[in-house]
Design a protein with these regions (language model features):
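Conserved, well-structured ligand/cofactor-binding cores
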Residues: 1-458
């Protein structure tokens, strides 16, 4: 491997000749050999750094034209665009487990954009600190990257995934409107319910989760950029914060604004905690929905067997013909991971000492993993399971009419205690509710048939 020599305030460092990073990134890659190649800084954060560096350059060009010249701006924004597009992702090797402020990742972005920009310009034009990092600090850029990446992940990936599954459940509701089945509480038989009503509960849960996600986006639109080192805005020109937020909004098409209090923006991560809470709520509902589906699909002969789900792959290496609810299991595992991540996000967010939180990389890593996993799990569940759910009408009818809880319909006619006696007799002797009720002398056969209609109990 060939190397070139780069330098920083600590001296010279050898860097791979074919990489755009420079001295500080190289030092970090050597000093933090933790999760190398596996737990690298999320691509979403790198993408966000490209956006904010471009936005900062555009703002500086207006507020400091003598420093951010047209020539520098052209080279810098072209290089930043390549970061945004993902073309330069191989030049961002740093792991999550580094400085808690994300300083090395900020410098990674500065160095890559500077060196690539210089290559575009054909001369040494850009300096990573003086130009790419102009009017900024790692302390305000990393919180900004966190918010940009969080908004893009939720708006562009998670919410669309939820919308798709909501649409699937709406279709299933319409297709199964007339089917009545046993309801269940405490995993025990309960009074009847329409299958469409059961599905509507799933759909409504997702609609509420969508509302919560949308609500959580509001605080995330506030950006720390312009607060610089401790929130005072030192070395940033007046008006930079509002202008750079407007530039980020223009680049992304999202309604980003400057945070009203930069001291809060640098040290507190309450917006991230709040948003992850909404993500966790969605994970909880997906856990419930996936569990419902796999219970209803259990069988085929010894379980509930009230629905059929798509057969995507062989279910067992030893039992031929077995079909497992694998998509449901994947969703529930993702839900567990998201719930665990919520603890990590909460703990990390609580570590804001004085003017800066120094657990930001782990906070961002877990937040973005939650959103990414949940969005992809929902898409997979919708495509490979939910969209192919088919009701087994015969099994639903059999289970419904074999349920002792239908006795509830007799309460107005024979009273609660007599209804309980009827159910217990039917269960103990293995006979129908009708036979038990008639033998106990509570109703005649004719009267029982007149008042007992499970389909009308919904």
């Amino acid at each position: 491997m060939e190397f070139r020599t780069e330098h920083d305030s600590m001296g010279e460092v050898k860097v791979p000749a074919d990489k755009y990073w420079a001295a500080q990134t190289q030092r970090s890659s050597e000093n933090f050999r933790i999760g190398v190649g596996i737990e690298t800084m999320p691509r979403e954060i790198v993408h966000a750094f490209g956006i904010l560096k471009k936005a900062a350059a555009l703002a500086n060009a207006e507020l400091r034209p003598e420093k951010m010249t047209a020539e520098k701006l052209d080279a810098l924004t072209k290089a930043a665009d390549e970061v945004i597009s993902g073309q330069l992702i191989e030049h961002f090797p740093l792991v999550v487990w580094q400085t808690g402020s994300g300083t090395q990742s900020n410098m990674n972005a500065n160095e890559v954009i500077a060196n690539r920009g210089n290559e575009i310009a054909g001369k040494k034009l850009l300096h990573p600190n003086d130009d790419v990092n102009m009017s900024q600090s790692s302390n305000d850029t990393f919180p900004t990257a966190m918010h940009i990446s969080a908004v893009l992940a939720i708006e562009d990936k998670l919410i669309p995934a939820v919308d798709t599954l909501i649409a699937t459940f709406k279709r299933l509701e319409a297709e199964n409107e007339g089917i009545v089945k046993s309801g269940r509480t405490h995993l025990q038989d309960a009074t009847p319910i329409k299958f469409s009503q059961e599905i509507s509960g799933w759909r409504s849960s997702l609609e509420r989760d969508r509302e919560l996600l949308t609500l959580a986006l509001g605080p995330l639109y506030g950006l720390a950029l312009g607060g610089t080192a401790v929130g005072t805005g030192l070395n940033a020109p007046r008006g930079f914060d509002e202008l750079v937020a407007a530039k980020v909004a223009a680049i992304t098409g999202k309604t980003f604004v400057t945070s009203p209090n930069k001291f809060h923006a640098l040290t507190s991560k309450d917006e991230i905690v709040f948003a992850h809470g909404a993500v966790k709520a969605l994970a909880c509902d997906m856990m419930k929905i996936a569990n419902d589906v796999r219970w209803l699909a259990s069988g085929p002969r010894d379980g509930l067997g009230e629905i059929r789900i798509p057969e995507n792959e062989p279910g067992s290496s030893i039992m031929p013909g077995k079909v497992n609810p694998t998509q449901c299991e994947a969703v529930t595992m993702v839900a567990v991971q998201v719930m665990g991540n919520d603890t990590a996000v909460s703990m990390a967010a609580s570590q804001g000492n004085f003017e800066l939180n120094v657990f930001m990389p782990v906070c961002a890593y877990n937040f973005l993993q939650s959103v990414r996993l949940l969005a992809e799990a929902i898409v997979s569940f919708d495509k490979n399971c939910a969209s192919g759910i088919v009701a087994d009408k015969d099994k639903m009818y059999h289970n419904l009419h074999n349920s002792l809880m239908l006795v509830t319909a007799l309460n107005p006619y024979i009273g609660y205690e007599n209804a309980a006696k009827t159910a217990k007799k039917a269960y103990k002797e293995g006979i129908s509710l009708k036979q038990a009720c008639v033998e106990l002398g509570f109703l005649t056969e004719e009267k029982f048939d007149e008042v007992f209609h499970p389909e009308l109990m919904v």
